[in-house]
Amino acid sequence: MPPPAWGWGSNPLEPVVHTVAAFSRRLLIAPDAAPDEARLRPLLSLSLSPPPTPPSPPPPPPEVLKKDSKAAPLTKEEVGRATWMLLHTIAAQFPDEPTRQQRRDARELMAIISRLYPCKECAEHFKEVLKANPVQAGSQAEFSQWLCYVHNVVNRSLGKPIFPCQRVNARWGKLDCPERSCDLEGSNDIIPNR
């Protein structure tokens, strides 16, 4: 293919691109078809221009951008409140007649938290609390009451108010799930069958 009348540009690959483009036109036209450009459907498109820049991601929805929100890690207190909320919710959902595995899981969960909790000082204190107050998970009521007691042990050490454990189910009762879909099912499977 001869160079175009206007000459080759500054791109050293320009002659190659033009040759490949001309060759691909010949390949894409059926032998019995007229070589009209409208019928060409290239499998590969080559261009000398730089690729277009991808569009920027859309801004987050307004509810995500709160005026008072801070872009900082959680405080020790925020992590503590969230952890207790999770633990009390788990205890509230704990079965009335747990399997041996569920009782073991409850003990193991507390042990794992005492090892992996993001506040080292808090984790060490929780280990001491667990040593003095081993996990009691024979039923939902027992586990919830034990957790409330342990939470109060921690609260006392921090000079915080004590929660009345007789109200634990009123505060962190069973989740409102249709057809008891929140109930724990005894299973040794890591990923339950669906």
Swiss-Prot record:
One of its GO terms (molecular function) is flavin-dependent sulfhydryl oxidase activity. It is an enzyme of class 1 (oxidoreductase). It is found in: Mitochondrion. Residues 72-172 form the ERV/ALR sulfhydryl oxidase domain. The keyword Membrane does not apply. Residues 44-72 are annotated as: Disordered. Keywords: Disulfide bond, FAD, Flavoprotein, Mitochondrion, Oxidoreductase. It catalyses: 2 R'C(R)SH + O2 = R'C(R)S-S(R)CR' + H2O2. Homodimer. It comes from Oryza sativa subsp. japonica (Rice). InterPro entries: ALR/ERV, ERV/ALR_sulphydryl_oxid_sf, ERV/ALR_sulphydryl_oxidase. Disulfide bonds join 119-122, 148-165, 177-182. Gene3D superfamilies: ERV/ALR sulfhydryl oxidase domain. Contains three disulfide bonds; one catalytic disulfide (Cys-119 to Cys-122), one structural disulfide (Cys-148 to Cys-165), and one shuttle disulfide (Cys-177 to Cys-182). FAD binds at residues 76, 81, 84, 121, 125, 148, 151-152, 155, 160, 171. FAD-dependent sulfhydryl oxidase that catalyzes disulfide bond formation. Oxidizes thioredoxin in vitro. Required for the import and folding of small cysteine-containing proteins in the mitochondrial intermembrane space, and can act independently of the oxidoreductase MIA40. Can oxidize the cytochrome c oxidase assembly protein COX19, a typical substrate of MIA40. This is FAD-linked sulfhydryl oxidase ERV1. Its main location: mitochondrion. A motif (Required for dimerization and substrate specificity) lies at residues 177-182. Its cofactor is FAD.
